[in-house]
Swiss-Prot record:
Binding site for substrate: 33-36, 222-224
Gene: PNPO
Recorded catalytic activity of this chain's protein: pyridoxamine 5'-phosphate + O2 + H2O = pyridoxal 5'-phosphate + H2O2 + NH4(+); pyridoxine 5'-phosphate + O2 = pyridoxal 5'-phosphate + H2O2
Pfam family, one: PNPOx_N
Pathway: Cofactor metabolism; pyridoxal 5'-phosphate salvage; pyridoxal 5'-phosphate from pyridoxamine 5'-phosphate: step 1/1; Cofactor metabolism; pyridoxal 5'-phosphate salvage; pyridoxal 5'-phosphate from pyridoxine 5'-phosphate: step 1/1
GO biological process: instar larval development; pyridoxal phosphate biosynthetic process; pyridoxine biosynthetic process; pyridoxine metabolic process; regulation of transcription by RNA polymerase II; response to hormone
Species of provenance: Bombyx mori (Silk moth)
pH dependency: Optimum pH is 9.0. Active between pH 7.0 and 10.5.
Listed GO MF terms: FMN binding; protein homodimerization activity; pyridoxal phosphate binding; pyridoxamine phosphate oxidase activity
Top EC class for this record: oxidoreductase
The protein's name in its UniProt record: Pyridoxine/pyridoxamine 5'-phosphate oxidase
Subunit structure: Homodimer.
Function: Catalyzes the oxidation of either pyridoxine 5'-phosphate (PNP) or pyridoxamine 5'-phosphate (PMP) into pyridoxal 5'-phosphate (PLP).
Cofactor note (record): Binds 1 FMN per subunit.
């Protein structure tokens, strides 16, 4: 019966007068837009709470955390590039930040980790829609110490620790049942009070060390505000007109939207 239904569906599609449209379908969504902030809600240099990017990030991040509509304010889209020059992006969770950089954890056998091994230059973006704000980070990544990775691993829920052991991230798998069977076996082994799940050697953390951090705030008239912190080029001097002296070796500038 199922095969007959599939045949009928295929025939109906093939005989459809709209088949040409279906094959060449192009949807125009150019008119989709939302209103951002009002003209009196601009993000100016005088509004910076810090003259270095980490203090400014802390301020914006805490505002995002305070908004219950933002379920995962620490989610960031991480972009990597393979040795062949092909980019890819995915969301990861930032698990710590400070003047040294931004921390995230993953499987060292994953696509992102293989990209990083061949090319440690990455970009990451936080986007908080309800605030009409984003933060763009460009820099390089380094592996965190094994001790750091192990300490964080054991702060995770046990089910998450087991999932990390059960999944060989980014490798093809026959079915979800295979994963579930691995998980079941690991649960039988480790879901025992007082028994610790060992961190897999292929799992750990990275530190994203920024070269630049850009703060973007959307404006209703599309003249968006962009203030970028970056490390100065060799011999570059701040003129306090276009380029401003920051703190801790940073400079900042306003960019056209």
């Amino acid at each position: 019966m199922l095969n007959n239904c599939v045949v009928l569906i295929r025939k109906s599609v093939l005989l459809s007068p709209n088949l040409k449209y279906i094959r060449n379908m192009s949807i125009d969504i150019g008119g989709m837009r939302i209103k951002y902030k009002e003209k009196d809600e601009t993000f100016l240099e005088k509004h910076l709470v810090s003259k270095e990017p980490f203090g400014q990030f802390k301020s914006w991040f805490e505002e995002a955390c305070a908004r219950k509509e933002i379920l995962e304010p620490n989610a960031m889209c991480l972009a990597t590039v393979s040795q062949e020059g092909f980019p890819s992006a995915r969301f990861v969770l930032c698990k710590g930040y400070g003047k040294e950089g931004f921390k995230f954890y993953t499987n060292y056998g994953s696509k992102k980790a293989k990209d990083i091994e061949g090319n440690p230059n990455v970009a990451a973006t936080f986007y908080w829609e309800i605030l009409n704000r984003s933060v763009r980070i460009e820099g390089r990544v380094e592996k965190l110490s094994e001790d750091d990775s192990t300490k964080y691993f054991h702060t995770r829920p046990v089910v998450s620790q087991i999932a990390a052991c059960a999944s060989y991230q980014s490798t093809p798998i026959e079915s979800r049942d295979v994963l579930c069977e691995r998980e079941k076996l690991l649960e039988q082994q480790y879901m025992i009070p007082g028994k610790e799940v060992p961190k897999p050697s292929y799992w750990g953390g990275y530190l994203l060390i920024p070269r630049s951090v850009e703060f973007w705030q959307g404006q209703r008239d599309r003249l968006h505000d962009r203030i970028k912190f970056r490390r100065p080029n060799k011999g570059e001097v701040s003129d306090e007109r276009l380029l401003h002296e920051g703190e801790d070796g940073w400079v900042f500038e306003r960019l056209s939207p």
